[in-house]
Curated annotation (Swiss-Prot):
Family: Belongs to the protein kinase superfamily. CMGC Ser/Thr protein kinase family. CDC2/CDKX subfamily.
Catalytic activity: L-seryl-[protein] + ATP = O-phospho-L-seryl-[protein] + ADP + H(+); L-threonyl-[protein] + ATP = O-phospho-L-threonyl-[protein] + ADP + H(+)
Pfam families per UniProt: Pkinase
Taxonomy, superkingdom: Eukaryota
EC number: 2.7.11.22
Taxonomic lineage of the native organism: Eukaryota, Metazoa, Chordata, Craniata, Vertebrata
Active-site residues, as the UniProt record annotates them: 242
Protein name in UniProt: Cyclin-dependent kinase 18
Phosphoserine: residues bearing it: 12, 51, 66, 75, 109, 417, 420
Amino acid sequence: MNKMKNFKRRLSLSVPRPETIEESLAEFTEQFNQLHTQTNEDGTDEPEQLSPGMQYQQRQNQRRFSMEDLNKRLSLPMDIRLPQEFLQKLQLENPGLPKPLTRMSRRASLSDIGFGKLETYVKLDKLGEGTYATVFKGRSKLTENLVALKEIRLEHEEGAPCTAIREVSLLKDLKHANIVTLHDLIHTDRSLTLVFEYLDSDLKQYLDHCGNLMNMHNVKIFMFQLLRGLAYCHHRKILHRDLKPQNLLINERGELKLADFGLARAKSVPTKTYSNEVVTLWYRPPDVLLGSTEYSTPIDMWGVGCILYEMATGKPLFPGSTVKEELHLIFRLLGTPTEESWPGVTSISEFRAYNFPRYLPQPLLSHAPRLDTEGINLLSSLLLYESKSRMSAEAALNHPYFQSLGDRVHQLHDTASIFSLKEIQLQKDPGYRGLAFQHPGRGKSRRQSIF
C-alpha cells in the first residue's frame, strides 16, 4: 500500500511532457498494472481490512483497460445528459440487437416514437377542401416543422379512393429534391391522412404575385427543376398525368417540387391502356383530347411546354373550356394537323367528326417574344402533335437553353437542391412587386387541385 501511495505522489508531482493524451494514459495504465503485479508477487504488503466502499474502489483501480477501451472513451462527448424518459421512449437504454430489425419491429419502433399517429400532428389552418379530401397546414410535435396534412375521408362502402392508394404507393419510393416528400401515413377507421413536407406557395401563386411577369432567368431555373423531377419519375416509368402550375409547389428558397400524384401511374409497358379522363384540360395533349388511351411519358411533356409558355408570357397557352374549344385553340396556333405532321390523325374518328378548318401554323416567337432563340426551340420540341416525337425530360435537361446555368447542375445528387450551388440564385422579377421571391400571404388556400 505504501508503494501505491508513493507512486501516486510521484505521478502528481511529475512535470508534464509534450505527449498526447493517449500516450499518457497508455503509460499510466502500463505502470499501474506493472506495480499491481509486483505487489501481488512480492507479498510484502500486509492485507488490511477494507470497508465495502474501499473494496469497490480497489476493484475499479485493478481493472485493466485496453487501448481500445481508452479510445472509445476519448471519442465520447463530454456529457450527453439526455432525459431518461426520452431514452426510454426511444429504447436507447437497451443494448443493440444482434440481428437487423424485422419490418414488423421497425414499424413498432416508429410507432413508439410517434409516426403513424394522428396525435403527433397539430392542425393549424385549413388550406382547402375538395370532394374526397381536406388539406390542413399543420405542425409535427416531433420535429416542430410545418407539414401539410391531406386528410382523405373514407367511405365505408368504398374504402380508400384509388387516387389516394396510387399516390401513397408511388410517393413512398420517390426520393428527389424536386418531388414533394411524403413524411408519414396515418390510417384510422374514418380517414387516411398523408403527411407531406410543407411548401406554402405554388407556381400559379408565384405568377399571380409577380403580376404574371417573371424574370426570364427565374423561368429557366423553375423549368430546369420541373424537368429534373420529371426525368426522375420517367426514368422509373412513372407518369404524372396532371401537370399544371397549381401542382408545382415552391418554397421560400425557390425550390420547385412536383406534387399531387393522385392521377400518376406506374407504367410497365408503353402500350398499356389507361383512362383518357386525366390531366387538366388546358395542359392536356391533343392525342389524349382525341380519345387516345395508349400513351407513355410524352403525355407529360406537352404539359411542360404549356407551362414554359405560361411562365414566359404570364398567360395560359390553350385556355379552352371544352374539348372542342381546346383543340380549336391548339390547331389555330400550331396549324391543323395533317398526315405529314401527325401520321394517322385522319383515321381518328373524333378528329374527323369535329371537321376543323384548315389552319396554318403561326410562329411561336410572335406569341412568346420574351423567349430567346433556344427557348423557342425547346418550346417547339415539346409542342409536337406526334407524341413519340416530343423531346423527353432527360433530353430537355441537356438542351442549350439551360447552358447558362453551368455544368454543375447536371452533376448533383438526386436529393441535392440546385440552390446548393452558389451560382444558382433567383433574380428580381420585373412584376409590380419587384421581388425575387416573397410569400404570397397567409390567406386563402393556395390550390384546389391537391384533392
